[in-house]
Design a protein with these regions (language model features):
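N-terminal module-boundary/linker segments of secreted carbohydrate-active enzymes
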Residues: 3-80, 94-98
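Extracellular-facing segments of soluble proteins and assemblies that are Gly/Ser/Thr-biased and enriched
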Residues: 89-185
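Residue-level marker of positions within ordered structural domains that often coincide
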Residues: 109, 215, 230
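Substrate-binding/catalytic groove segments of enzymes
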Residues: 113-116, 207, 216-220, 234-236
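...with weaker cross-activation on analogous glycine-rich loops/strands in unrelated enzymes
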Residues: 161-219
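Low-complexity, Gly/Ser/Thr/Pro-rich intrinsically disordered linker/tail segments
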Residues: 221-276
């Protein structure tokens, strides 16, 4: 007791001040977009893009309420709810179609649809066939004979969103990580932009989408990743396994094999989808 009393007297005499530690808050539960929901790390600011660019589109895409669970296409709750920090508010359909590559195709398709850039909505299928939305809109439908695919005019012109969704579902059936690999090219980490992917083509393969990017005054960058997965499920923003409290991935810490919650990517998997 004497030693404790002396210690207390010493503290009072030195006027020792205790500072309250306030942790950095990464999640704003009231935010309904990436920009408003997930705060950048302390000392970092989001890199700004033109409002009509894809990075701004996905940064401001609606999210489901904070704390929402990831659901499968059949209405069942995904057993593992520990991998995500946010969920994009976009339907996944009622069939097991919108998986990993399909989710990225969906976001690019929705972006071009919102921009009314209909000529840019075109995706290669796994066999190399280019499936153009404008041909679908004009009434053409796929004629599949084994590995051979061609257009067959069987319907009327239809530019409705409902028809556009049917087009995307057909793309999901015949496209995947293998076709996405053929449309993409490797990039260096210092070139990273929202819309780039970590992609490993295969059966199965996997891909995740870079959905946001921030930078500090020293030029260090960090980014957010999102994914769909198998079976088809909500498109969700991933946690960082290295720090579950901080969803940002830091370029300075990135090494290969690159570990994400659902997949480990090899070197050379960082790619950009080239707009040909």
């Amino acid at each position: 007791m004497i030693k404790q009393d002396l210690l207390l007297q010493h503290i009072k005499s030195k006027k020792v001040k205790y500072k309250t530690f306030i942790p950095h808050l990464f999640i704003n539960p009231d935010g309904m977009t990436l920009e408003d929901r997930i705060n950048p790390p302390e000392g970092f600011s989001r890199i700004q893009f033109d409002e009509d660019d894809f990075p701004s589109f996905i940064r401001n895409f609606p999210l489901k309420e904070d704390g929402s669970q990831v659901y499968f296409y059949n209405g069942m709750i995904k057993p593992n709810q520990d991998e995500h920090v946010a969920i994009f508010d976009i339907d996944i359909g009622e069939r097991d179609l919108q998986q990993c590559a399909d989710s990225i195709i969906r976001m690019y398709g929705e972006y071009y649809w919102a921009q009314e850039a209909y000529d840019k909505i075109a995706f290669h299928l796994t066999n190399g066939f280019l499936m153009e939305y404008t041909k679908w809109r004009d009434g053409n439908r796929l004629l599949v004979d084994g590995n051979n695919v061609s257009w067959n005019h069987t319907s009327e012109y239809d530019d409705s969103y409902e028809s556009f969704r049917k087009y995307l579902d057909m793309v999901f059936i015949y496209a995947g990580t293998l076709s996405l690999s053929e449309e993409s090219r490797p990039i260096d980490l210092d070139m990273l932009l929202p819309g780039d992917m970590f992609l490993q083509g295969g059966s199965p393969g996997h891909c995740v989408l870079v959905v946001d990017l921030a930078e500090n005054q020293q030029g260090d960058k960090c980014f957010l990743l999102a994914q769909g997965y198998m079976p088809a499920q909500d498109f969700h923003v991933l946690k960082n396994p290295k720090n579950p409290q901080d969803p940002w991935y830091y370029a300075s810490e990135l090494s290969y094999p690159f570990i994400t919650p659902s997949w480990t990517f090899p070197e050379g998997s960082l790619v950009r989808w080239f707009d040909e």
